[in-house]
Amino acid sequence: MTEPVYAAIEAGGTKFVCAIGTADGTLRERVRFATRDPDNTLAEARGFFEAAAQRHGTPQALGIASFGPLELDPNAPLYGRLLRTPKAGWHDADLIAPFAHLGIPVALDTDVNAAALAESTWGAGRRPDGTPLDTLVYVTVGTGIGGGVVVHGRTLRGMMHPELGHFCPRRHPDDLGFAGICPHHGDCLEGLANGPAIVARLGHELGSASPDHPIWDIEADYLGQLCALIALTLSPQRIVLGGGVMQHARLFPLIRARTQHWLGGYIARHQVETG
């Protein structure tokens, strides 16, 4: 008997990744392509799954992890659509309807919520015995800044979904002259601390910044404020930091120190690991 397969989409602002795999996470086939306009991008994804079904069998279900913001309430008129996204041309794009003809269940969540669920299932959100932690927050710091929250195996949803990148931190004293680049809030966390914001200050690519450049202290301060906010409001058992900016390992001890600073000794329990 053929092992059941599942379909998945990682819908990013610059690229789409479509895959077929099994329930244990084994990939059978994967393809990636550039994110263009909604019609052409979603048509390419649809074509991949139609062809893949001939090779691997009809998937049991499709999971879509997308950039946002998204309408995730199945009872809402705009369910499955992108809302006020900064991605040009994608406002009001329907991510579910193009795959209705596959005749399989479709699950939708944000890319960071999905990443949080993956960390909880297979990655850094597990205890030493392999069981998942009860609560986890995953933060990505890259082109954008976002956070996903898992509580007892389910991603957190409410009025919409967490948008941790859009709180407004206290400005670093050496960064008062930078206006921020968020089109909605200017100097929110994303507008101050995402990859493009760092590049805007440096005037060159992030990878060429020296390890002792003061930008890292500024970046760590803003991310430390975020971690302190998460600890005080959501009280997760673990915060996982990922994304392109976090490839700069020097940030981890700096963020840890600034998190402790902003917590002010109010929460003494902490554990920071890198890897």
Provide a role label for each language-model segment:
Residues 10, 111, 142:
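Active-site glycine-centered loops adjacent to acidic/histidine catalytic or metal-binding residues
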Residues 151-152:
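A cytosolic small-molecule/anion-sensing beta-strand core signal
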Residues 1-61, 70-79, 96-105, 121-133, ...:
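ATP-binding/phosphotransfer module of carbohydrate and carboxylate kinases, centering on a glycine-rich
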Residues 106-110:
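General beta-strand structural signal in soluble alpha/beta enzymes
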Residues 14-15, 142-144:
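Short, small/polar residue-rich loop motifs at catalytic or cofactor-binding pockets
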Residues 35-36, 162-165:
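A short acidic/small-residue loop/turn micro-motif
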Residues 147:
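Active-site histidine-anchored catalytic micro-motif
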Residues 76-91:
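A charged helix-plus-loop insertion that forms the helical arch/lid used to bind
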